[in-house]
A protein has these predicted regions:
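Bacterial N-terminal signal peptides that target proteins for export
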Residues: 1-9
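C-terminal motif of bacterial Sec signal peptides marking the signal peptidase cleavage site
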Residues: 17-21
Length: 414
């Protein structure tokens, strides 16, 4: 009996110890995760804020827009006291952009080509803005171009010819397009005088005899503006004379043609035929090739000059030579009209070439560009021709044209 009681007590004690251990283990197991969770919350890495989709592009666009605004600010025709600083700021903003950001530049006038297009080596040009001018100055006035190679070949080519022919005269340069002056200054750090700057420079250097030789094609609106600028300075010099533009006097109608237009017609045609690889204009005609010389066009009364040039081509027997204009003024020089005339003549090959002193923006883009509204693209899209080629060369680089300017200058110096 006593033994049974001992066994029973031992069993109860073992059960109690088991229950006590199980309770202790359960409490400990529940407490460990709770203890571990506290430090986990303290050391957890903060989540990164989500970047809105497109925010990086927006930042790039903002920088591109800033550069575009600075470019638009210097795309103006008036020079101010802030112009030099604005040109520098526009270039600095462009240089700070990445290549990807530069492709986003788009303003009223600004685009990636403003600073990004390679137009040649500006260091080959001479702005001819030096002081130390002698008593006799020959000021060569051009509209201007931002295409470096064309500026050197066409404008500098004329200036060099005039300087060689007039060694006793100081040859200087002026552009009438401030927009172009700003472009060249901002991009290439080349400073070219506008008309006011050039005339002020001449007066400040004690010039007595001033001869102005415009490189303009005709007596158009730009020539009129040049005359107004010169007249305002006439009392600053002992004598002021202005030579004829390339095509000379305008004349009264399309049938009245002067010797200058004949000389230009012969010179540009001969150069175009040679560059196209033909021995003569007749050889080109037999090959079914026509030449289209493209001018700017104008609403000015001087637009009759283009009609006179077409008449002159006919008088010379140049049946496969046609005159067109970018602006389509006069009407018969519009692209559609010229295309029809070329097609009706039975010509299947077309060679486009500028009837412009400088092969600049109009020649490179409006005439020979890849856009659908360029003359080359429209002639090609018409399907009327087997081939359409473009010769990008200004009149100013043709020796016979340079000689004509020299003759015009000599005429007023006599």
């Amino acid at each position: 009996m006593r033994r049974n009681m001992s066994v029973l007590l031992a069993a109860l004690l073992a059960l109690a110890l088991c229950l006590s251990g199980c309770g202790s283990n359960g409490t400990s197991s529940a407490a460990e995760p709770a203890a571990d969770s506290a430090p986990a919350e303290e050391t957890q890495e903060p989540e990164e804020a989500e970047v809105p989709e497109g925010s990086e592009e927006a930042s790039d666009q903002e920088k591109a827009d800033e550069a575009a605004a600075l470019i638009d600010a210097i795309y103006v025709q008036q020079r101010t006291d802030e112009t030099d600083a604005q040109c520098a700021a526009a270039k600095a903003a462009w240089d700070a952009l990445t290549d990807a950001q530069k492709e986003l530049v788009e303003g009223e006038e600004a685009d990636p080509d403003y600073f990004g297009r390679d137009t040649g080596d500006a260091s080959k040009d001479d702005p001819r803005n030096q002081d130390e001018i002698r008593e006799n100055e020959l000021l060569v006035v051009s509209f201007g171009t931002s295409f470096n190679d064309s500026r050197v070949a066409d404008i500098k080519g004329i200036e060099d010819a005039l300087a060689a022919a007039n060694p006793d005269w100081s040859v200087r340069r002026a552009f009438t397009a401030q927009i172009i002056i700003n472009h060249v200054q901002a991009r290439d750090d080349e400073k070219i005088d506008n008309m006011q700057q050039a005339l002020d420079r001449a007066a400040a250097n004690g010039v007595k005899n001033l001869v102005v030789q415009p490189t303009h094609l005709m007596h158009g609106a730009e020539y009129d503006e040049l005359m107004e600028a010169v007249e305002a300075y006439e009392d600053r010099f002992e004598s002021v004379k202005v030579a004829e533009p390339l095509l000379g006097e305008v004349g009264t109608d399309a049938t009245v043609i002067n010797a200058d237009k004949k000389a230009v017609a012969e010179a540009v045609t001969a150069e175009a035929v040679k560059d196209a690889g033909y021995d003569s204009l007749n050889a080109a005609k037999e090959d079914g090739a026509a030449f289209v010389f493209l001018g700017h066009g104008t609403s000015h009364t001087a637009k009759v000059s283009y009609s006179q040039m077409q008449t002159q081509m006919g008088d010379l027997g140049y049946d496969n030579v046609f005159i067109g204009t970018v602006e389509g003024e006069p009407e018969e020089t519009a692209c559609e009209a010229v295309m029809e005339a070329v097609a009706e003549g039975g010509y299947r090959k077309v060679i486009l070439r500028p009837l412009m002193v400088v092969a600049g923006d109009h020649a490179n883009n409006d005439m020979a560009g890849d856009d659908e509204d360029s003359w080359k693209s429209m002639f090609t899209a018409s399907g009327k021709f087997d081939s359409v080629d473009a010769q990008i060369a200004g009149l100013g680089q043709i020796p016979a044209i340079q000689d004509l300017y020299v003759a015009h200058t000599a005429a007023v110096m006599e």
